[in-house]
Structures are given as C-alpha cells and as structure tokens.
Amino acid sequence: MEQNWTNPYKNISLTPYRLIAAGGGHSKAVLPDGTLMGASDLKRQLKYPQLFAWNAERKELDNWNKYLQENPGCGIDLVVDSGAYSAWSRGKLFDVDEYIDYLNADKLIDTCFWAAEADVIPGSYGVDPTEEERLAAPQKSWENYLHMIERVRFPKKIVPIFHMGEDYKHLIRMLTYQFKDGDFIPYIGISPRNDMPVVEKVKWYDRTWKVIYDTCKKVGREIPLTHNFGCTTVNIMEQYPSCSSDSTRWLKYAAFGLILVVVNSRTKSINVSNRDLLNPNHINNQPLSVRQAIDDVCAKFGHGLTLQKIVEDDKGDYRALFNLFSLNEWRKDFKYAGTPEFKEDLW
C-alpha cells in the first residue's frame, strides 16, 4: 500500500466553525407544512460536519462515506471516531488492526476529514482504574497512534488525543513529534472530562493552551488545529481557538424533552415537555427574551415550525431538528472572543 504523507489541512478555512453534530437521529418527520425531513436531510442542507463511531454506527458511517464520494463538492466534513469508549464501556476488546482495515477499505480514510486514534481507556467500566492503569493508558494510546500512522493511506489524518487528567508530557510529545518528512502533527484532539464542572474545564483549558503555545514557540512550529471531544459549551468554544468540537447534545437533549438555544454566548437547555413544570428551565418559566430567541430560530427554520408545534411533538423529532438548526445559527456566526495571545496564529 502506498501512503500519502501530504498535509490535508494546508490553507483550510476555519469558518464556519466546525461544530460536529455527532449521531444519526430520526429518519423522516412530517413538518407542519407537510415537508418530509430527517436529521440527515437537514445536516446535508446546512452542511453540518459529521462524526460516527466505526464500530457502533457503521451503517450511518458507510452511508455518509458513499454520499460524500458521490458528492465530492458538497462541503461536508466526515469524522471517524474510534469507538474505543463504546467498546470499553461494553467490556469488549478493541482490535486496532480491524479499525485500520476499516479505514483503508472503501476509501474511507481518503474521504474523511480525519479519524481519531485508538485511544486507550484506563481500567474497566464501572471500576476505578489503578494508578498503574491510569499512567499506562496514555503511553498505550501513543503506541496505537504510531501503529496506525504506519498502516493507513493518509497518516496525517489520524488525530492523537490528549485527555484531561493526563500528564502534560503526553501533550508535549504530540506537539514535538515529527513525521519522517519533518512535518509536525497537524491536528490534535483535546478531551475534557464530562463529569467535571465547566469552571474546572476552563482552568484545564487555560493550562492546556498555555502548554500548546509555549511548546510550539519553543520548537518553532505552527499552532496545530485542535478538536474538542464531547464539548459544545459555547463559551469554551469561543474562548479557545479550536478548529472543531463534537457533541450528541442536540440528539440526547431532544429525547428528554429539551431544546437548545444560544443566548448571550450561553447555551440554554429549555424543557418543553409536560414534565417538571415548576423547573426553572421549563419553557413556562422563561423570560420573554428566551421565548423571542426560540421564535426567531423557528422563523428562520420555516416549514411552519413554531414553539407550540415543538411542545406538541411527542416523538421529539421537531426538537432534534430545532436543536440542529439553532446550533447552526451560532456556528455560522462564530466569532473567536478569547485571549489575543491564543488568537494570533490561528484566528
């Protein structure tokens, strides 16, 4: 197999922001004006970047790979997740070589924007990892990364991942590693812990980006493109100069009766179900400004969609479509608002 060692990210556009709507969603829903629309239809219309785990969402991934090969100029980025967490949480062994074979098959690695490394989760699901397991996981992840880049057709599309709680020496290693052609790794994943409050994530991001800038300056390399795994906290995305973020919130929140709307750089989750009517986040208890923001999104979406129609939708399909459209309104108007030092090289 001949490998292509070119950097696929030279001179890529950073706008609109690559907010990746992970997950599939419903197939088709009848909108108030009679239009049939599924989540995939809206994603294609809005040119939403996509992310699917190869071992848990293979059908969706294969469908999108085929669509992008048939529509090469559609402007949609496809990201492949390793699914390592999914396998770990189910107690299944992860086969790195099977993952590599899948990436090389059907030209998926050619089509995709990037593919995540096979990162190693310490310990077993539901059991606290030992200190030895916690310290060994980043090294095993790095070994998997090195194994992968020697065996896929586009090595520079493999993204290594730095996790919250890991020693910063592992991030520095990613930033200073050079391929055999002398290039540095162009795209790096940053993964905060979802069980940590936002204030703690912000502290970690501050330190992480300081390490990125200090290290890049020291070795004389450009600031890498970065991806925030499992993060759609708007103020974090606006504060730090990442290239992309992914989350399934649009889908998961819809399933629990919630819609998402961005107000003053904050993502508000609004309960529009007939449960928890006294909850401060219920639509009945929202100020006029929030209701107006929801009405504005509905008006831009069109197809007769209104807040009342969303409330009356028992299946949650309207909520999912609203969430996709609402977050897209934010991403297409994205403005970096962070530290000037962090902004200078990327934004």
PLM regions and their residue ranges:
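C-terminal accessory extensions appended to soluble enzyme cores
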Residues: 1-9, 255-347
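Amphipathic, non-transmembrane alpha-helical secondary structure
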Residues: 61-65, 93-104, 139, 143-146, ...
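A generic structural signal for alpha->beta connector loops
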Residues: 75, 112, 155-157, 223, ...
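Glycine/Thr-rich beta-alpha phosphate-binding loop at enzyme active sites
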Residues: 126-131, 157-233, 248-273
